[in-house]
């Protein structure tokens, strides 16, 4: 195992393309012998025969962008000494590169998790003669700023354009959709509502059709973030300003139905369903699909099957929106044979199973620990011409991560790279989680480097996990560097992560670095709240003082034992003492488990 990881580590250092390497082929041979065969479909043929581009997609900007220019600016932005602002703009001037809309778009795509750096790039590009801002790039800038919760800067950009002659060309309904969704995601309900109301008053987007679309976006954004009650109340309020005969659209009902089900409020969902029928709003396939998915989400698969029968009686077309939730619900309930039987019924439909159907089955077979069953589903979908996606393989990585099968997980990763697949952020998070939990720090750092080379920056969860592992291994300079890089990318680390590094630095006498860390943290908006379980232990002095504290508790317990005659009290005290000592010993491991785990990504 160690030699296998050593080979991979050397391979990553020497070759950015690990699939062109002897070690990889040896690993692939090992994977075929040591684990159930997980088929991986090569993408070489697809690359040689590109599909006809979809006219609805964003035009391919990469083709018109100089790779040299893109690489030069990307390397500059990844330099840890570069900070957003005028100094970065001066450094960009020194490159001599003339920015284009396509180049800036490509940078936004590549460095999406570094919003403040990208804002400086945008300001630099905008000042260049001949640079013409496009509506899609403007919306990307607004989205990037809102993602970093720099709403004030985003609004200043919007207001500047609204007041100018180019406002109607740049500030569109899509701009306000970005603002509304980002506010909702940040839990800022009233601000999301005010963004919608401002859009209603802005003449270029206040047409009735656009206003209804924005209302639906607002309700959808609030419901998806769990603010269904607020969405319902606002709909009632705005309904009072409409014509007396106004009835919410079926889409609005669908959004609220989905919201109540997502919030697990079954009574409210069923009440809304009755109101919809009372208002003679005709349900659509989406409505029935929402009901079925909602019941399945709440583990009421049998009721979902009854709704399916109701659809049949209404002679409505039954498609993937109906079958997929039922198949997933049966799988989640462990009724995998019934899920396969339902898929057989799905085959007779015109549309047939989709990638979502197969991914659901793969997910639930992996959850059940049936890796051969999941592999069979994978072979089935390939046979039927459905290409597996990164999401498909991520379910296998979840299985390997959960069951500490690091070698099998790494073997699958190599096979995907060799076949031409591009792992996504979740793939790397799961791989890093496996390696961190297995204590393979060197390999984890190399995989982290490989992830960045592929243009994927680690998110908060991945960054937290790496920093906590570095702290546990007392690699404090590396932990500080990861913390600093995260802040530069616009990520605000958790306060408990700061405390772990700070305590470690101070215990090692690294006071200068501890001061730099404190200065960095004080510049960020953050909460100083720590989990109650860990507050005393994290803030407590380490090593010698902790041992003194434990000895003091032991002496106190000894004194109590001498004078206590009640056996029940002794049992209670003993349990309390064991718990306290256990918390002292296992503190850092507990922190890592709570803050480092990715959870169950769907």
Swiss-Prot record:
Gene3D superfamilies: Tetratricopeptide repeat domain (1.25.40.10). PPR repeats lie at residues 134-165, 172-202, 211-241, 249-283, 284-318, 319-353, 354-388, 389-423, 424-458, 459-493, 494-528. Pfam families: PPR, PPR_2. InterPro entries: Pentatricopeptide_rpt (IPR002885), TPR-like_helical_dom_sf (IPR011990). Coiled coil: none annotated. GO terms for biological process: negative regulation of abscisic acid-activated signaling pathway; regulation of seed germination; seed germination. Disulfide bonds: none annotated. Keywords: Mitochondrion, Repeat, Transit peptide. Residues 1-35 form a transit peptide. GO terms for cellular component: cytosol; mitochondrion; nucleus. It is found in: Mitochondrion. The keyword Lipid metabolism does not apply. Belongs to the PPR family. P subfamily. PANTHER family: ATPASE EXPRESSION PROTEIN 3, OS08G0290000 PROTEIN. This is Pentatricopeptide repeat-containing protein At5g11310, mitochondrial. The lineage of its organism: Eukaryota, Viridiplantae, Streptophyta, Embryophyta, Tracheophyta.
């Amino acid at each position: 195992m160690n030699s296998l990881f050593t080979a991979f580590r050397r391979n990553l250092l020497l070759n950015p393309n690990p699939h062109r390497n002897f070690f990889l082929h040896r690993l692939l041979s090992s994977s075929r012998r040591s684990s159930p065969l997980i088929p991986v479909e090569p993408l070489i043929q697809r690359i040689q025969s590109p599909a006809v581009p979809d006219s609805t997609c964003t035009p391919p900007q990469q083709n018109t962008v100089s790779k040299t220019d893109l690489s030069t600016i990307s390397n500059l932005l990844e330099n840890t000494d570069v900070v957003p602002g005028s100094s970065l703009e001066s450094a960009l001037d020194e490159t001599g590169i003339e920015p284009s809309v396509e180049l800036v778009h490509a940078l936004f795509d590549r460095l999406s998790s570094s919003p403040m750096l990208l804002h400086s790039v945008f300001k630099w590009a905008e000042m260049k003669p001949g640079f013409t801002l496009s509506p899609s790039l403007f919306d990307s800038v607004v989205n990037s700023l809102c993602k970093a919760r720099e709403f004030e800067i985003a609004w200043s950009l919007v207001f500047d354009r609204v007041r100018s002659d180019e406002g109607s060309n740049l500030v569109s309904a899509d701009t306000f959709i970005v603002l509304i969704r980002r506010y909702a995601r940040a839990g800022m309900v009233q601000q999301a509502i005010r963004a919608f109301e401002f859009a209603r008053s802005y003449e270029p987007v206040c047409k009735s059709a656009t206003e209804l679309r924005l209302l639906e976006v607002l309700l959808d954004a609030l419901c998806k973030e769990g603010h269904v009650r607020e969405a319902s109340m606002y709909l009632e309020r705005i309904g009072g300003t409409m014509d007396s005969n106004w009835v919410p659209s079926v889409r609005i009902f669908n959004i609220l139905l989905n919201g109540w089900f997502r919030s697990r409020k079954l009574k409210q969902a069923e009440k809304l369903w009755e109101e919809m029928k009372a208002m003679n709003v005709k349900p659509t396939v989406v409505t029935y699909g929402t009901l079925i998915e909602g019941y399945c989400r709440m583990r009421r698969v049998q009721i979902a099957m009854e709704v399916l029968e109701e659809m049949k009686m209404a002679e409505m077309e039954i498609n993937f929106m109906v079958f997929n939730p039922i198949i997933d619900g049966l799988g989640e309930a462990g009724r995998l044979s019934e899920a396969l039987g339902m898929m057989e019924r799905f085959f007779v439909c015109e549309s047939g199973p989709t990638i979502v159907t197969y991914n659901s089955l793969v997910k639930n077979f992996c959850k059940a620990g049936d890796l051969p069953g999941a592999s069979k589903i994978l072979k089935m979908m390939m046979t039927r011409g459905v290409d597996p996606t990164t999401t498909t393989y991520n379910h296998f990585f979840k299985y390997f991560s959960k069951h500490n099968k690091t070698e099998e997980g790494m073997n699958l990763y190599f096979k995907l790279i060799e076949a031409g697949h591009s792992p996504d952020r979740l793939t790397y998070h799961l791989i890093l989680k496996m390696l961190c939990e297995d204590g393979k720090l060197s390999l984890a750092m190399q995989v982290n480097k490989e992830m960045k080379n592929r243009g994927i920056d680690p998110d908060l969860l991945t960054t937290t996990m790496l920093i906590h592992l570095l702290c546990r291994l007392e690699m404090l300079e590396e932990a500080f560097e990861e913390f600093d890089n995260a802040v530069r990318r616009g990520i605000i680390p958790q306060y408990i992560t700061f405390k772990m590094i700070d305590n470690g630095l101070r215990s090692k006498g690294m006071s200068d670095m501890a001061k730099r860390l404190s200065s960095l943290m004080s510049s960020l908006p953050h909460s100083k709240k720590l989990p109650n379980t860990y507050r005393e232990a994290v803030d407590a002095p380490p090593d010698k003082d902790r041992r003194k504290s434990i000895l003091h508790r032991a002496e106190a317990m000894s004194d109590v034992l001498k004078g206590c005659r009640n056996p029940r009290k002794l049992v209670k005290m003993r349990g309390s003492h064991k718990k306290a000592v256990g918390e002292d010993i296992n503190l850092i491991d507990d922190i890592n488990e709570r803050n480092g785990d990715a959870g169950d990504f769907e």
